[in-house]
Amino acid sequence: MINGKKMGLGILSYKAPETLKKTIASLEQQKAGSFFDDSVIYFNDFCDRDKEIADAFSYRAVGGPNIGFTAQQQLAEHLDADYIVLIQNDCPLIENFSELKKQLTMAVELIETGRIDLMRLRHQWHVGEGFCDVEKYAGFYNICVVNEAFIAKEHGLDEEGLKHSWVKSFKRYIRPLKARRLIGRSVYVEKSPEKLFPKYIQKTGDVLIVDSECIDYTEQSFLIQKDFFLNTLCKFINENPKKRTLHGFQVPEIILNCLWWRKKHFKIGVCKGLFTHNRFDDSFRKNHLFYNKKI
């Protein structure tokens, strides 16, 4: 509980039992569960094996048929909390308990005072697999001063990928809207993004606050007020289905990353972060080492 507000942890899971076990183990190692008032795992395609895993770690298990990432709504609804941290089964904790308490307390205070609407919790530097924000940003912008904490290999980049080029200015000229939408990604590589883009990025303490006009919504690892998540974001998702889907399922990221999101000017917090992204079995992505075509 933070300032009288209940805290909830929700994990969305589909298949990948070994990955889930490693993620839960990372939380258990730091006794993260003691920080939360409620902890729930929501299983897509819920089965007996899933419940056995949850029971083994003393997590409450809920679930149903596979409905994809939109199951985050059901996950949130099952959490008895005012603020919820939503992660996925492949998002292990990589910081200690003290850092977890510090960052989540700070995030709640920023939301309570109206400074931010959502706090991203994917680690700013140890981003894990499948993160292409910096690569895309560097395709349109020359890096001014690389942050000393930046780890190029985390992004599959080398000096060639970060070198300066006049072509980037031309790309921004012919595609100004896309260039603007990429500005928020500067927080993962630039030393002082708030000085480069003061119109869109501010800094308070160790937190960068980015206008949603130039940073995407992400389903992976974030803290948010439960009421705001359900009655604002999920409401929009449910009312605006898209033709573009993933394996036939609606995808919150596809639905929310639209003109509505950009014009709402939500304030997205980016801090050091707590969770990375690593998968060890049952990936649905064809280019993944652990791709499983049967799921």
For each feature predicted by the language model, list its residue ranges.
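Cell-envelope/extracellular polymer assembly enzymes that use nucleotide-activated donors
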Residues: 6-8
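Short, well-formed alpha-helical segments that are part of the catalytic scaffolds
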Residues: 16-31
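C-terminal catalytic/acceptor-binding lobe
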Residues: 22, 174-295
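Acidic donor-binding segment of Leloir-type glycosyltransferases
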Residues: 27-63
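Glycine-rich, basic loop-to-helix element that forms the pyrophosphate-binding segment
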Residues: 64-79
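Short aromatic/hydrophobic "clamp" motif used to bind/position activated sugar donors
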Residues: 84
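The conserved acidic donor/metal-binding loop of glycosyltransferases
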Residues: 90-92
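Conserved donor-nucleotide/metal-binding helix-loop-beta segment in metal-dependent transferases, i.e.
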Residues: 95-127
